[in-house]
Curated annotation (Swiss-Prot):
GO terms for molecular function: 3'-5'-RNA exonuclease activity; nucleic acid binding. This is Oligoribonuclease. It comes from the Bacteria. Keywords: Cytoplasm, Exonuclease, Hydrolase, Nuclease. It is found in: Cytoplasm. Belongs to the oligoribonuclease family. One of its GO terms (biological process) is DNA metabolic process. NCBIfam families: PRK05359.1. The active site is at 129. SUPFAM superfamilies: Ribonuclease H-like (SSF53098). It holds the Pfam family RNase_T. 3'-to-5' exoribonuclease specific for small oligoribonucleotides.
Amino acid sequence: MTANVNNLIWIDLEMTGLEPDVDRIIEIATLVTDQELNIIGQGPVIAIHQPDEVLAAMDDWNQKHHGESGLIDRVRASQDNEAQAVAKTIAFLEQYVPKGASPMCGNSVGQDRRFLNRYMRELEDYFHYRNLDVSTVKELVKRWSPEIMEGFKKQNTHQALQDIQESIAELQYYRSKVFKI
């Protein structure tokens, strides 16, 4: 596959919390779409090993959701650290998108970018500085055409790959209902 500057990199992280100064990344997944939002590649879905003290420091919400999904067990069993996750992810991305070409795509990607900047700087640097944030479209639709919101329901699994797939489907939905371009 030849890398294409028009392809889009979609990313989702699962973290132990919302504060990059104290919380850590525990899962990463990436997908690549063409400019028409067709999925053309799935990157590795990586649970990132964290010590038990990091996992024990998670709040109740994170303990519950990441426990029920099996992510905590996958993190404990994982042999991958953050540097290995970065290397594997970039090796995948290089097949589809040149460095610096794609905005960071997903839902609430500003939060993901904060964690990448702190713990996976090389991966954060792979993206263009711009974001394609589906949550921005959602906020606009909620205010300007709230009736459209009822046509798309998210599952909110808080599993990185499923969350990205849902973000792409959500943008496809908004594209069909809102954008006439």
